[in-house]
Structures are given as structure tokens and as C-alpha cells.
């Protein structure tokens, strides 16, 4: 089923934004035993702690690791390149330019390779370094859906102030890892970024289903090649 991002906003209630922001301040200050941290979702709190121990800055822009021709060559050779049409069809049906979300596909190292979707939102997310070639791994920018999904090997939803990097607090995101259908090694990650609608239950189901569809299509393509 293709996405309809304006439909559902049924994300489960979390601790208030103010409480999360205060807890984040305490963690950045090194107060890992502060009681406010216990009010933060365990998945988020544990990711914050990993980020803090890795000395990730709470406001730094991500590093651009792939640019121009190097990025083009890497994308062309990446195993997820052949899946982009399917990802667009499932997550950006209709007019992507006014979809209300940004869809990103990255490699297993957390580097973003393709970023598509709502043109107005993309002009805003560009400002925080959410661009093709940038490293959004957890150990580079802290807690985010794509980076933490790769770290944990499972789909992840991060809402607003749950992000480790303050530059990302205006945004919410859901991401799911993609694995090689035979070796089960990580190949990359699929992410949707936008407002609260992208951290709904429906959004997680759609992103998970898209990742599984990509894996299935890869396996079918390989079996066809072997049969020829």
C-alpha cells in the first residue's frame, strides 16, 4: 500500500517536549543519573548515552563525505540503486514535490545517497545538513532514525526533541534498515522525515513494508539471473 502522509497522526504520546529537552541538557552536561532521563524512552536514552560517550557534538553539522562525481559513481554501483523506483512508488506516490515529507536512502555506513520529496521541506532540511553525501550515522550526529536504525538493526522512530542534535529538533523521522536477502548483512537504510505524521504507527508499517519489499525484489532479481 502506498503512503498517504496527510492521513494519520496517531503516534503514541511521549514525555513532553520540555521534559525531553531538559533531560537532554542534563545528559549533555554529563549528568547521566539525572531522574529526568528516566522519563525518556529507553531506546532514545540509550542512544543518547552512546552518542555522548562517543563525544558527538549536540549541535554540529554532519560531515559531507561524498560529493559530485564520487557520489554519482558510488550511487550508481550501490545495490539499492535498482530499488529507487520501488521506494518512490511506495513512499512518494503522486506528486513528490508536495508530498509533505522527505524520503532519504542511505548506505550501511549512514551516508545519505538519495534525498527526494517535498521541495519546500527539502529546502529546510538542507539547512541542517540533511543532504546527499552527508554522514548521518549515530556515531557522527547522534540519535536519528536512520543512524539509530542502522545501529540497532531495526526500524526506529524519533520525534522532535528526541534527536541528539539540536539542529534536528524541529523534525521527526522513521527509518528501517535494508538487508541483503541472502546474507542478511546490512545494505542501507530508508528514512522518512517530516512532521508528527511520519512517526505514526502507519508510517512505521509503511517504511518497514517498503524495506521488506526491496529485499524481496532483490532476491527475485537474483533468482531470475541464475535461472537464465
Which functions belong to the PLM regions below?
Residues 1-134, 148, 157, 170, ...:
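Intrinsically disordered, low-complexity terminal regulatory regions
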Amino acid at each position: 500500500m502506498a503512503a498517504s502522509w496527510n492521513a494519520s497522526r496517531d503516534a503514541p504520546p511521549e514525555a513532553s517536549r520540555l521534559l525531553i529537552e531538559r533531560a537532554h541538557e542534563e545528559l549533555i552536561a554529563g549528568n547521566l543519573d539525572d531522574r529526568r532521563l528516566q522519563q525518556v524512552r529507553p531506546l532514545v536514552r540509550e542512544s543518547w548515552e552512546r552518542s555522548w560517550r562517543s563525544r558527538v557534538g549536540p549541535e554540529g553539522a554532519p560531515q559531507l563525505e561524498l560529493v559530485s562525481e564520487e557520489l554519482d559513481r558510488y550511487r550508481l554501483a550501490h545495490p539499492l540503486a535498482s530499488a529507487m523506483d520501488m521506494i518512490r512508488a511506495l513512499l512518494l506516490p503522486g506528486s513528490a514535490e508536495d508530498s509533505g515529507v522527505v524520503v532519504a536512502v542511505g548506505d550501511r555506513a549512514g551516508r545519505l545517497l538519495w534525498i527526494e520529496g517535498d521541495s519546500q521541506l527539502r529546502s529546510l532540511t538542507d539547512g541542517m545538513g540533511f543532504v546527499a553525501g552527508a554522514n548521518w550515522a549515530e556515531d557522527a550526529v547522534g540519535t536519528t532514525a536512520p543512524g539509530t536504525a542502522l545501529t540497532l538493526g531495526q526500524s526506529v522512530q524519533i520525534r522532535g526533541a528526541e534527536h541528539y542534535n539540536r539542529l534536528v529538533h524541529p523534525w521527526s523521522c522513521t527509518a528501517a534498515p535494508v538487508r541483503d536477502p541472502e546474507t542478511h548483512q546490512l545494505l542501507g537504510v530508508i528514512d522518512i522525515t517530516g512532521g508528527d505524521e511520519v512517526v505514526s504507527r502507519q508510517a512505521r508499517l509503511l517504511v518497514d513494508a517498503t524495506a521488506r519489499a526491496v529485499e524481496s525484489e532483490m532476491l527475485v532479481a537474483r533468482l531470475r539471473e541464475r535461472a537464465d
